Structures are given as C-alpha cells and as structure tokens.
C-alpha cells in the first residue's frame, strides 16, 4: 500500500542522483519488495544481516512516513531508534528522509528520541511544520533540520498502456467520475459509519460521483470499509491497494474527489491535484494539511453526515488543488536530493 509507494518515490529520487546506486531496503516482505521496487531487500528483523550490510554502506535513510512516534507502540519507536544507532555505529551517515515526527508522548521515550537523534542523525528533512515543532519540543538541535515535503508528492504514474490496463481491470469505467473514501479502523470509528455512508451517497446523488471504498492497508482497513459498504444504497466499488506504488497513485489521480483518514492517500491526491477532504485521527494528518494550506478537514469525532457533506460541497466548488501550491511543494521535495 502506502509504504510501497513511499519506497518507490525514495528509490526514484536516489536513482535520479545516481542510476547505478546500490540500494537495500528493509522490509517485512523482502521477496515482494525486491520484485516491486527493483532493489535488494532484507527482512526487517534480521538484525545480524542488517548490521553486516550496514558496514558496507555509506548512508542510512530512515523514512519516509512517520516512524519516530510512540502512538503505535514504544516497541516500534525503539526499533527505529536502535536501527539509527546501529547504522551510525556501523559507519553509515544517517539521514531521516522526508518524514513525519511524532507524537512522542511518554517522557522516557522523549528522552530516548532526543538522545539518539542528537547523537547519531546528521540531517533530518521533514514533511510538515508539526514535525518541526515536535523536534523542537523534544530538544533535538544537533542535526541539520530542513522543512521539505513528502517524497510521495513526486510520484508520476504517467499514462502508459500498462497504467490504462490496470485502471480498466480495477473496474474504473471511462466517462464515470469517482469519489474515493480511504478509511481505517480507529477508536469510536463505528459511531461514524453511517456518516461516511451518507456522505458517499451524497457525493453520488449531488455530483454524480461513484464511491470507491479504498483499502490503503487491506488487512487493517477492510473491515471498516465493509461496514460502510453494508449501508450504501448506491453503486460503489470496493478496491484494495496493491504493492505497486505507481498504480496506487494512478488510481487516485483518476478520482474527482478524495475523502480520507489515511495520510498517504491525502498526500498522493494532493500531488496529483485532486480535491481532498481530510478526516483527522492523528496530528500527522492535520499537520500535513496545514502545511499544504488546506483547511478542508475535521476531527474524526466530529465527522457527521452534515459536516462531511459541507466539506464535500466546498471541495467540489473550489475544484482546486492549486497547481501553484503543488509545484512549490514539489520544489521543496526536490531539496531532499540536495
């Protein structure tokens, strides 16, 4: 899903710098990653093999995405901090690349994060101001810090026969317009199922947009989308993201509107100039949208049929995603290469 698309974007930037650069990605599914991204790959938890590879590498990139946070778990945070430490000790230069930071809320985790990043990271490029503020609050001052943009904004799926074939086989019909809903399970999500279903029906009734219920992370998101689908009384598609980042972005580009909780769905839509409505379950979502100058979002707990329909009206009326806004973000993202 989104992780594969991020990797595709990072690999493309690195290949732009040096087409022959050997790249090794850490992955939970290394066989799939090798095939999809055309890079070498090691299993995320093969620590001895990773350490051996690091001794022969010059640079360790941590990112994109939001890896330095303890919302998921302290264990997840400790893994990413320890990988940074291990890379530096193996002789790699360390860069956190086009990433989000935070929230880091537990006091002990704040100390660990500041200590590790101050000691081992050389450069940190961030995708939003919220992350910059989080680093400042943590006391991270030693690395060079640059506010750039998410690497995923640079993905260009093109308009190849393969892309057209993929869209056709996904069930997207020529001449039909679509509104994509990228939702995920979260605390009290069940209380808002009817609101999302009503909003999807509204988009269909008022604007002729067929709802696409899109599982960016299929294993996690499927149940939430099925619950919304069960309440729909209009035609819809239920689709799942595959492992090809270019195809994910091509599908999102085909949409007339995107309503999403999933951050990278919003990032991909913004990069393609598709109008977006954000539903915020985590500060990283509002942080990105604020950085974009985009105010069409609301917290999940305030998601009602009326509020969602109002935002849909505004997004459809503005029909912006200002090309100038996107261009400036892409220019910022190019700074990741520098």
Locations of regions flagged by a protein language model:
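Active-site anion-handling motifs in enzyme catalytic cores
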Residues: 1-338
């Amino acid at each position: 899903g989104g992780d594969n698309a991020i990797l595709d974007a990072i690999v493309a930037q690195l290949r732009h710098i040096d087409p022959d650069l050997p790249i090794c990605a850490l992955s939970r599914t290394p066989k799939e990653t090798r095939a999809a991204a055309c890079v070498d790959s090691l299993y995320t938890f093969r620590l001895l093999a990773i350490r051996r590879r690091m001794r022969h590498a010059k640079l360790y990139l941590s990112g994109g995405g939001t890896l330095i946070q303890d919302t998921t778990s302290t264990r997840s945070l400790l893994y990413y901090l320890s990988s940074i430490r291990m890379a530096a000790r193996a002789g790699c230069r360390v860069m956190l690349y086009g990433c989000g930071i935070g929230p880091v809320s537990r006091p002990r985790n704040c100390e660990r994060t500041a200590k590790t990043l101050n000691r081992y990271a050389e450069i940190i490029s961030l995708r939003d101001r919220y992350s910059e503020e989080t680093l400042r609050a943590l006391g991270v001052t030693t690395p060079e810090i640059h506010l750039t943009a998410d690497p995923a904004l640079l993905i260009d799926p093109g308009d190849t026969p393969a892309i057209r074939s993929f869209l056709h086989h996904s069930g997207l019909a020529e001449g039909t317009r679509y509104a994509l809903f990228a939702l995920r399970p979260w605390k009290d999500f069940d209380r808002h199922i009817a609101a999302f279903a009503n909003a999807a029906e509204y988009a269909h009734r008022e604007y002729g947009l067929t709802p696409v219920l899109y599982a960016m992370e299929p294993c996690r998101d499927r149940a939430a989308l099925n619950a919304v689908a069960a309440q729909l009384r209009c035609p819809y598609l239920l689709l799942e993201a595959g492992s090809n980042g270019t195809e994910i972005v091509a599908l999102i580009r085909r949409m007339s509107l995107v309503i999403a909780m999933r951050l990278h769905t919003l990032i991909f839509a913004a990069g393609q100039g598709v109008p977006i409505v954000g539903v915020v379950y985590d500060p990283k979502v509002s942080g990105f949208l604020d950085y974009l100058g985009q105010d069409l979002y609301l917290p999940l707990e305030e998601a009602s049929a009326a509020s969602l329909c109002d935002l849909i009206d505004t997004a459809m009326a503005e029909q912006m995603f200002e090309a100038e806004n996107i261009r400036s973000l892409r220019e910022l993202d190019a700074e990741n290469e520098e």
